[in-house]
């Protein structure tokens, strides 16, 4: 098939008529499909439901001599701190095990910077005239919502095949008002990029003008391969310490896509000094998080090796879904030259870059045909994609049969939007 840009006006008009007919057929099916967020599917949830059968007798609730049914240490039970240190490659004293969401810990970390300041802050950030933040784009919408909620000025930096454009990052951190940077370093959301060793090294050795700069390291997909073997990843905490930046990095992870979204365990890892400081502050707002759930996860996941074996089972469910989307894009979109897309081997998303000015229109057409997707612009600060071109696809929730229907709708809508943009 010809690329749309190589077609004559008459050829594009004929193609447009044919695609419109297909679109009307899809609309008539009365679909109601959702690919808006990276939610695990039912088969994945069924996989981990046995976790609820592990605590049945009174003695089951005792770990390291601690009865988790009672009050306890705010930073988490020792067994949970050991487990997540094993998974992340750091030390137990560098781990804070919280409640059901790493996002809550990210929000709390930024919040404490504003209300109390960090270890190396001259004053709480709420007393500063301006706070700026580096945001690699496309990126994670919920990260951007956190900093936006504090009135932070977000500065977009483009992603490359190796991670964020480090030349731009290194120029920006010379400004003392630049206080932090979001990162999803492994299988980035939404592109699935793995930061290169060189990029990670440059980030770890940065010398920001702000002494309390926060390198926010959301390692959400640290063990989330679906199309390859586990990829080992550097321990950013020890690397930062090596370059004299022990207190600069704040790493986050959770079991949201290992066990249950919204009912798993969220983790923050940082220097032991940072963990002690945050434990003191967080202990004012809570006596402690759900230790029973922490122990439940320790007993179910056991250690890194056992957790990776579980992730292989998740991968067997996820891989066919990603393949269904990529196969459809390869067949229906790639030959037409109207979009580019990444081929991730881990994470939870596929990033598609359509022709400038076509993302919103494509997704509006999808919605009209009964398919809900992540909103256009969500992958940029303030929800504003300057090119109106990036679309995030989340294949994980629907069964493959429904997913094939949804991606057929998407491809058809993308064709219509591209043809209208080119002129018919």
Residue map of PLM features:
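Short amphipathic alpha-helices in soluble, non-transmembrane regions
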Residues: 362-368, 406-411
């Amino acid at each position: 098939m010809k690329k749309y840009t190589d077609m004559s006006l008459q050829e594009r008009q004929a193609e447009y008529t044919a695609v419109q007919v297909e679109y009307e057929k899809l609309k008539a099916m009365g679909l109601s499909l959702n690919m808006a967020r990276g939610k695990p599917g039912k088969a994945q949830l069924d996989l981990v439901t046995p976790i609820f059968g592990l605590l049945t007798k009174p003695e089951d609730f005792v770990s390291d001599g601690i009865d988790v049914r009672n009050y306890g240490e705010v930073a988490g039970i020792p067994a949970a701190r050991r487990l997540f240190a094993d998974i992340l490659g750091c030390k137990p004293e560098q781990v804070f095990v919280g409640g059901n969401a790493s996002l809550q810990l990210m929000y709390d970390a930024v919040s404490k910077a504003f209300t109390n300041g960090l270890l190396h802050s001259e004053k709480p950030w709420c007393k500063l005239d301006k706070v700026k933040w580096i945001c690699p784009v496309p990126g994670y919408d919920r990260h951007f919502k956190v900093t936006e909620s504090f009135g932070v000025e977000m500065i977009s930096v483009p992603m490359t095949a190796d991670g964020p454009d480090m030349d731009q990052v290194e120029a920006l951190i010379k400004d003392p008002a630049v206080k932090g940077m979001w990162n999803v370093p492994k299988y980035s959301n939404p592109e699935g990029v793995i930061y290169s060793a060189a990029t990670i090294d440059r980030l770890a050795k940065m010398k920001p003008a702000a002494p309390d700069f926060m390198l926010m390291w959301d390692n959400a997909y640290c063990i989330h391969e679906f199309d390859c073997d586990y990829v080992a990843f550097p321990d950013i905490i020890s690397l930062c310490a090596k370059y004299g930046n022990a207190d600069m990095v704040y790493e986050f992870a959770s079991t949201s896509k290992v066990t249950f979204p919204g009912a798993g365990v969220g983790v923050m890892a940082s220097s032991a000094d940072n963990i002690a400081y945050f434990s003191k502050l967080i202990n004012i707002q809570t006596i402690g998080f759900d230790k029973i759930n922490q122990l439940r996860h320790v007993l179910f996941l056991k250690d890194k090796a056992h957790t990776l074996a579980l992730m292989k089972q998740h991968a067997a469910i996820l891989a066919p879904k990603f393949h269904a989307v990529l196969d459809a894009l390869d067949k229906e979109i790639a030959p037409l030259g109207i979009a580019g897309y990444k081929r991730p081997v881990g994470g939870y998303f596929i990033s598609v870059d359509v022709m400038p000015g076509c993302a919103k229109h494509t997704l509006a057409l999808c919605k009209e045909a009964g398919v809900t997707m992540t909103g256009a612009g969500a992958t940029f600060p303030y929800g504003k994609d300057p090119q109106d071109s990036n679309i995030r696809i989340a294949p994980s929730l629907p069964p493959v049969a429904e997913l094939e229907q949804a991606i057929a709708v998407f491809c058809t809508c993308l064709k219509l939007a591209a043809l209208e943009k080119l002129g018919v």
